[in-house]
């Protein structure tokens, strides 16, 4: 007898599987067929589950019951969302994937939970990802995290301010160092290259880094405060690791990589014993995926792979992309207890200015880094005054003024 719905996939529930050895992906599905009041969601769910595990579009003899029992994903949750539209069916679906299928291989895990499944429905989003304990043990996570960065910067309780070097590219190494020196004088805690700059023809990493660090040290001799500089090293994986080593040899006390380098490359970089400085993950490349993968999922994966700090969307941004709840949930995922994995510093960002300090800190709390480019450098009294205005705004909020 042929069953319409495979028992190996559907005769399951969350309470009955070995959660320690599974990854559980939660999806939002929404389908609409005009004039069709019957939508077979379970057939769609079955296709999603098999696509991320054992499935082929045509049954083959090697695809046995034993193979599916051991390797296929299992539907452990189906929660239909009521709709007044008879032609719409929406649900939150949970699929459990066995870790044995790919071990601690992050690219393969991402392929399973967020690969061809997106071809099966116009409205499908990966909303959460539960990582089983046996898989979690195999990841180091951030080396520094919130506590390590606080110790490095000397800022133990309040939010940190960060100067984004602007314009994105085009400046010489000397101009870059000069700009950093001015914001360091104003008390900025950190600075970073723009994500678009790595090795421009007129401003390579090896050219600017020594000049920037020299300027930071010059200011530190006067103020007693040494700014952390996150130097951009995004490149091909092996080149990026070599570049990171070179940057540290040249005095870098922080590194910046982008999501476009890949989660595997991020993990390789952050877990390498030679990399003894914090690593920031820039999330701009994630915007291309935000309609299909929720930001908290991406934040969780980046924390898992070792990001010490990571940009966080906020509705107060000049380019708001998410709701308040989605932005805050992204921050919570970075800070919530998670076994041995250290906390990742959230960085609510994009077009923020000192006048937003109260609402940003009120919503996100003190464990944040606030990056500002034009919102610091655009001060009418200059770059130093812009950095000072951020320090004053943060101090006022923390004092309850």
Give the label of every model feature segment.
Residues 1-71:
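Short Lys/Arg-enriched alpha/beta "domain-start" segment
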Residues 26-38, 159-178, 227-239, 284-293, ...:
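Active-site mouth loops of central-metabolism enzymes
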Residues 52-53, 57, 67-68, 203-231, ...:
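Alpha-helix-loop-beta-strand connector modules within alpha/beta enzyme cores
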Residues 56-137:
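Phosphate-/polyanion-interacting regions in eukaryotic proteins
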Residues 106-178:
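Acidic/glycine-rich phosphate/pyrophosphate-binding loops and surrounding catalytic core
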Residues 188-209, 314-317, 321:
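Glycine-rich, proline-tolerant flexible connector loops at the mouths of alpha/beta enzymes
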Residues 242-245, 250-372, 385, 389:
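Catalytic alpha/beta core domains of metabolic enzymes, predominantly
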């Amino acid at each position: 007898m042929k069953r319409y719905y495979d028992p190996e996939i559907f005769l399951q529930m969350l309470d009955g599987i070995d959660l320690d050895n599974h990854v559980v992906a939660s999806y939002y599905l929404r389908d609409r067929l005009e004039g069709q009041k019957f939508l077979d969601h379970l057939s769609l769910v079955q296709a999603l589950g098999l696509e991320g595990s054992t499935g082929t579009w045509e049954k083959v003899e090697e695809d046995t019951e034993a193979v599916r029992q051991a390797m296929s994903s299992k539907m452990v949750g189906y929660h239909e969302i009521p709709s007044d539209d008879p032609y719409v069916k929406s649900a939150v679906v949970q699929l459990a994937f066995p870790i044995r299928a790919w071990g601690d291989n992050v690219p393969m895990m991402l392929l399973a939970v967020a690969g061809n499944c997106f071809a099966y429905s116009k409205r499908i989003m990966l909303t959460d990802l539960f990582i089983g304990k046996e898989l979690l043990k195999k990841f180091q996570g951030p080396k520094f995290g919130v506590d390590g960065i606080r110790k490095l910067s000397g800022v133990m309780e309040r939010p940190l301010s960060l100067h984004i070097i602007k314009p994105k590219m085009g400046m010489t190494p000397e101009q870059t160092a000069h700009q950093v020196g001015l914001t360091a004088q104003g008390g900025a805690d950190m600075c970073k290259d723009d994500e678009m700059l790595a090795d421009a023809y007129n401003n390579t990493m090896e050219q600017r880094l020594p000049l920037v660090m020299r300027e930071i040290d010059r200011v530190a001799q006067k103020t007693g405060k040494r700014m952390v500089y996150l130097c951009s090293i995004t490149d091909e994986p092996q080149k990026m690791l070599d570049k990171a080593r070179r940057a540290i040899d040249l005095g870098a006390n922080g590194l910046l990589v982008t999501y476009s380098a890949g989660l595997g490359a991020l993990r390789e970089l952050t877990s390498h014993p030679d990399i003894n400085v914090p690593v920031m993950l820039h999330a701009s490349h994630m915007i291309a995926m935000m309609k299909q993968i929720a930001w908290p999922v991406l934040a969780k994966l980046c924390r898992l792979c070792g990001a010490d700090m990571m940009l966080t969307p906020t509705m107060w941004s000049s380019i708001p992309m998410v709701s308040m709840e989605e932005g805050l949930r992204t921050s919570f995922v970075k800070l919530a207890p998670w076994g041995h994995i250290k906390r990742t510093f959230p960085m609510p960002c994009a077009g923020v200015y000192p006048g937003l300090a109260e609402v940003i800190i009120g919503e996100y709390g003190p464990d944040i880094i606030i990056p500002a480019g034009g919102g610091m450098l655009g001060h009418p009294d200059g770059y130093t005054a812009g950095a000072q205005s951020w320090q004053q705004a943060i101090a006022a909020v923390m004092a309850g003024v």
